Amino acid sequence: MEKLNKNVFSAVQPSGQLTIGNYIGVLREWILMQHDFTCFFCIADLHSLTVRRSSAILKNSVLDVVATYLACGLDPCKSVIFLQSCVHEHSELHWLLTCCTYYGELIRMTQFKDKARKNSKNINVGLLSYPILMASDVLLYDTDVVPIGLDQKQHMELICNIARRFNLLYGNTFKIPKNKMSYYGSNILSLSDPTKKMSKSDVNENGVIFLLDNLSSVKKKIKLAVTDSDNPPRIRYDKDTKIGISNLINILSCFQNRDISDIEKEFYYYSYQDFKSVVIKEIVNFMTNFQNLYFSFRKNEDYLEKILSEGSKRASWYAKKLLKKVKTSMGLF
């Protein structure tokens, strides 16, 4: 089947292990989209520099992400898988867009305000200008669609505002991308505190299932997952009064590719313990297959580096054309 004439861009930072929430909300969507669109899937190592880490850890983390991409089902023949820092046009466009962005816009970003409040004495400029680099990432590939979670909605609005402003100042240069909201990924919640999103930075690891977790640890985490005190227990989806069980129903529906209503009908009378056993079986089955593939790819670093090298060359070919168009619009040589 021929691909649609549309470009997709998305990225993941090489910072910490990915979770089943990342898989459901991000990677699973990518796998489906690669068959129908021209997809640019970036490993955003420049973004990760806002947090200090050793160079050895960063390099290993990059290769971990490539192996994760492949193990989840991304095909380097169907998608452009590349490293952000290897395509220098990202940094150059970042500066050009910085000159079209207002300070007030950046300090209003919710993520920046949250991080500044938590660590007010150690805020670097990179954290403030993070959304502008994100804009250069997206706009550099004539992007039509950006799959995002709810937490990136404000950044996407800023990216579109920057693109429109540039077009008004210098002529029609950038496409205005549309975001594709991931309902599921934004709604995979912590197992231990289902009022919060499942996050790889959660201090309570019992609330998070990492893709590389030991399988016995996965079983334990799900067994300990918060439910409710209904008597008799009922497997029913209700985000207001049964948030813990609703989270487990959501997870199971994603891994089984079934409607939530189907899950409710089949398991309505199950005990919470028995329902958790069903969830455990489904996740462990997925993770067993994933981890076998992951470790097979991860031990072949030459192959992973080759994918990055070839993908970065392909990305650079697209990026050079767009950057030339931008510079011509601005009167730069």
Curated annotation (Swiss-Prot):
Any GO CC annotation of this UniProt entry: cytosol
Chief localisation class: cytoplasm
GO molecular function: ATP binding; tryptophan-tRNA ligase activity
Subcellular location(s) per record: Cytoplasm
Cited SUPFAM superfamilies: Nucleotidylyl transferase
UniProt cross-references to InterPro entries, sorted A to Z: aa-tRNA-synth_I_CS, aa-tRNA-synth_Ic, Rossmann-like_a/b/a_fold, Trp-tRNA-ligase, Trp-tRNA-ligase_bac-type, Trp-tRNA_synthetase
Residues that hold L-tryptophan according to the record: D137
Keywords assigned: Aminoacyl-tRNA synthetase, ATP-binding, Cytoplasm, Ligase, Nucleotide-binding, Protein biosynthesis
Motif ('HIGH' region): 14-22
Alphabetized Pfam families for the sequence: tRNA-synt_1b
Quaternary structure annotation from Swiss-Prot or TrEMBL: Homodimer.
Family, per entry: Belongs to the class-I aminoacyl-tRNA synthetase family.
HAMAP family: Trp_tRNA_synth_B
Protein name in UniProt: Tryptophan--tRNA ligase
Organism per entry: Buchnera aphidicola subsp. Baizongia pistaciae (strain Bp)
Primary gene name: trpS
